[in-house]
Amino acid sequence: MRKIPNPSDFKAAFCRRTYCNQKQIGVIFIAKLVVAEKPSVAMSYAKVLGATSRKDGYLEGNGYLVSWCVGHLVELAPPNVYDAKYVKWSIADLPILPQKWQYLVAASTKKQFGILQKLMHRPDVDSVICATDAGREGELIFRLVYQQAGCKKPFSRLWLSSMEETAIREGFQKLKPSTEYDALYNAALCRERADWMVGINCSRLFSCLYGQPLAVGRVMTPVLAMTVVREAAIAAFVLEKFYTVALTLADGGTASSKRFAQKADAELLLSKCRKEGRVTVQKMERKEKSESPPQLYDLTALQRDANRLLGFTAQQTLDYAQSLYEKRLITYPRTDSRFLTEDMAASLPGLVTDTGRAFAVEEPIPIHVQQVINGSKVTDHHALLPTKSMANADLAALPAGERNVLRLISARLLCAVGEPHRYAETTLTTICAGENFSSKGKVVLSDGWKAVERKMLGELLGKQKEPIVLPDVQEQSQCSVAGAELKEGQTSPPKHFTEDTLLHAMETASADSMPEGVERQGIGTPATRAATIEKLVQKGFLERKGSKKTKVLLPTDKGKALITVMPEKIQSPEMTADWETKLLQIERGEKEPETFMTEIKKMISSLVTTTEARKGANTLMKNKVIGICPNCGANVVEREKGWFCENREC
């Protein structure tokens, strides 16, 4: 593979004399077509490559044409394209399982597709470079355009984890053969087609069974089911009161008894303790402990912290991170890795120093590089990092949301290479009136990485807990009781899901049921989990309630009703997580795509032939009546896309 020269050398490098035939000799500039995923990224590529001449839908110069997609330009055709009878929804026509898949150009992006198609067929273009996002969906976006355009020219793959100019230049010098990503493309195709088959067949099946539009999704429905199960557990929870006796010791500190279910038992102990007036030290145990630095961020971990500390939704965090990536301030955001590769070790100390300086961290930062290096745990992209470009950027000019997300990512880098947080934990066991009382104290020995965390995120972390210092006493010694009181408490129900905890539940779904040695994928991927939550909210299955930082995600009545009528196999997180694991195996070339698709088709066929409407479910699925139709007097009901008269003839 020839080396990509600097832009100033491009004309000489890419101009070659071509003999069209024996009678006609001409000079043609041979160009390479670069296809990015979006215009802003294409602009960054064009700047590095020297393609500075703006055209309609692309840039040109120095041997390159740089154009872009606008999301998915090509999409799966709807059922009626396969057969006109599918316009009408009928259980008799199910399952719909295409043998030969058909695709259409999205109506809203036909112009840009046309531009790409013309560029791919230009006689001076000898090859194409796939420069869409380096991941499963980016691969799919390009390949569908390439195939739909009927392009047969060779193409190579640009694979980047950073949008810095040096990284872009190096990436174009080290283009990958397209065949290295065939398995990734196969996994993307399987994911897209499986989602289509589940969505089309299940949505039609249950809509027909219950007489109203019901949206069902391979990933969406299990996530909704998790929230419904959680709310059912909260509703079924029975609060139980309990009672404890709390002693205030004259030498300092407090001590608590065990819990009593009966108030009378606790009151009896309280009376005895007041009468006895002193405790005997039975055991004093001191242990030194440490808390290791946190791992670097992957996307899901970043989204969880941004929700917990900043109140951002998962989608907001992804949008901010994507913008920072395109501004060359962070590395590729849609990563599922929390480590770096061995070849990054040498440059990491400089990045840590630059990052600390950018955020005015004046204290010396210990740098333990090996804590974050583990190439065996890096998949397509390494963990999220700030870039060196950030050191010279005007951070104050960034929108507040982007600035806060950048601060989180930078703080995590500084913490991850830091020293352990060390503390001493003391447990004091005393006896009063024949009953054991316990006290716990904690004293910080060395702040370690938490000092940097407080410096970077102090206002976001909230008020720190004061250390609890227990009196220095000897075993079998006695201490006077300065006060005793009865305290009443109650057991706590499960907590409502927040975006933070729901992301965690999606990430860890089916962990207990996975066989030993099998890599767990959870529900969805880091790149799709935010979109899944947003889709559930937009379709009216989930709603956000509460203040910004404490918003919870609650299933609506519509969401609860949908899960009530769903068969277990459709709402099962375990099955969906198993599919994600199999998609990963396809991506790695460990599983045949045809085998996976056959499994999906069998499941759908079985579902269609065995599922019947549940008795009484129509009552649950009934739409909300909001008024009377002025035309015919029938009920006007609220549905997903607006208000409709129940009378189909109206």
What are these regions (language model features)?
Residues 10, 14, 18-192, 196, ...:
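Intrinsically disordered, low-complexity regulatory segments
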Residues 29, 79, 124-129, 250-272, ...:
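OB-fold/S1-family RNA-binding modules
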Residues 101, 123, 165-249, 286-290:
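C-terminal or mid-to-C-terminal helical accessory/interaction module adjacent to the motor/catalytic core
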Residues 179, 263-297, 303:
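Metal- or metallocofactor-binding catalytic centers and their adjacent structured scaffolds
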